[in-house]
Amino acid sequence: MSLRDKLNELHERGLAEIQKSTDLKDVNQVRVSLLGKKGPITEVLRGMRDLDAEERPKVGAFANEIRDDLTAALTKRREELENAVLNARLAKEAIDVTLPGTPVAKGEPHVIQQIIDQIEDLFLGMGYQVLSGPEVEEDKYNFEMMNLPKNHPARDMQDTFYITKEILMRTQTSPMQARTLEKHDFSQGPLKMISPGVVYRRDTDDPTHSHQFHQVEGLVIDKHITMADLKGTLQVLAHELFGDKFDVRLRPSYFPFTEPSVETDITCFNCGGKGCNVCKNTGWIEVLGAGMVHPNVLKMAGVDPDVYGGFAFGVGPDRFAMLKYGVDDIRNFYLNDVRFLTQFTKKG
């Protein structure tokens, strides 16, 4: 039998063995047995040395064709088996898309965040900036630049979590007044900003107090700002949050960083201003503190109080939420009880 005949026989036998392979291991074994260094094709090619010079290149070229054809057949069979394995796995792990899916619970903004978002949207529409500041604050900004020097008796009104003698957990969002006033360029226009955030007090948690709660600081500084501007702004805020039927009343009060200072009341939710046990028969409920910015606060921030003035106010979203929805215990907002919180969502 000539070498060409032997190669033809190996070619036919090899193709048959490749086709009979049932897994990738079989394919690899056939490859080694046919094309390996000790395989029959290699053995046949060793006999080429006995051929004459004219026949040798022809047989060599034919042998390479056989080798290439077997290699292509091995590659094709390997791909067929790999696809078969993949298809079997996909069939086994198939998902029936006609079955109803498991619903994923959708989150909703917390009721207090809803109040904050409503306040932000209102003041953004009025041209205010919304700024945020650090919760770990310097004594300088939290107290001193708010007209509360060391040993000032008004500091006792705000029991404070101190980290060091000069670093504390802010007791109010008012420090953003000082931080913003320091940087503002009044040649570019007036300063109008609100600053929502979390504040901390060393209070014992009870139905109306929490050691951690929210505030929204408001500040407007420009020439010729008056108390009428403050009252008008608070009236708009009350109408936005509670409705047009609620009126605003200002009462004299004291805050170190404003002069004059006022407590702001709105019409009682329960009786509509007629007087009841909720409002202690006054027809009004206190909701926030405000006032005209104290000249000392302006001076310490490098602003001339003879040229510029303005007003500031501090809103408590937690208290607003309690009043708006008739919640009698502030702690309920922080217990993560979905049954309670869902009342204040679209789903509730």
Curated annotation (Swiss-Prot):
GO molecular function terms attached to this record: ATP binding; catalytic activity, acting on a protein; magnesium ion binding; phenylalanine-tRNA ligase activity; transferase activity; tRNA binding
Cellular location(s): Cytoplasm
Enzyme Commission code: 6.1.1.20
Binding positions (Mg(2+)): E259
InterPro entries (alphabetical): aa-tRNA-synth_II, aa-tRNA-synth_II/BPL/LPL, Phe-tRNA-synth_IIc_asu, Phe-tRNA_ligase_II_N, Phe_tRNA_ligase_alpha1_bac, Phenylalanyl-tRNA_Synthase, tRNA-bd_arm
Catalytic activity: tRNA(Phe) + L-phenylalanine + ATP = L-phenylalanyl-tRNA(Phe) + AMP + diphosphate + H(+)
Keywords: Aminoacyl-tRNA synthetase, ATP-binding, Cytoplasm, Ligase, Magnesium, Metal-binding, Nucleotide-binding, Protein biosynthesis
Cofactor note: Binds 2 magnesium ions per tetramer.
Record-level GO BP terms: phenylalanyl-tRNA aminoacylation
GO cellular component, one term: cytoplasm
Co-factor requirement: Mg(2+)
Oligomeric form and interacting partners: Tetramer of two alpha and two beta subunits.
S-adenosyl-L-methionine among keywords: no
PROSITE patterns: AA_TRNA_LIGASE_II
Pfam families: Phe_tRNA-synt_N, tRNA-synt_2d
Protein name in the entry: Phenylalanine--tRNA ligase alpha subunit
Main location, first listed in the record: cytoplasm
Family: Belongs to the class-II aminoacyl-tRNA synthetase family. Phe-tRNA synthetase alpha subunit type 1 subfamily.
HAMAP family: Phe_tRNA_synth_alpha1
